[in-house]
Amino acid sequence: SGPAQKQNVVNQLLVLIYLYKXDS
């Protein structure tokens, strides 16, 4: 539990935003 978990969450959020933007 540390920066690795936070980076994982940020990565997932980035992918979600990317998909959301691309979908529009």
Curated annotation (Swiss-Prot):
Tissue expression as described in the entry: Hemolymph.
Subcellular localization, as worded in the UniProt entry: Secreted, Extracellular space
Keyword tags: Copper, Oxygen transport, Secreted, Transport
An example Gene Ontology CC term for this record: extracellular region
Principal location: secreted
Transmembrane residue ranges: none
A GO term, aspect molecular function: oxygen carrier activity
Domain of life: Eukaryota
Function in brief: Hemocyanins are copper-containing oxygen carriers occurring freely dissolved in the hemolymph of many mollusks and arthropods.
Family statement: Belongs to the tyrosinase family. Hemocyanin subfamily.
Name listed for the protein in its UniProt record: Hemocyanin subunit 4e
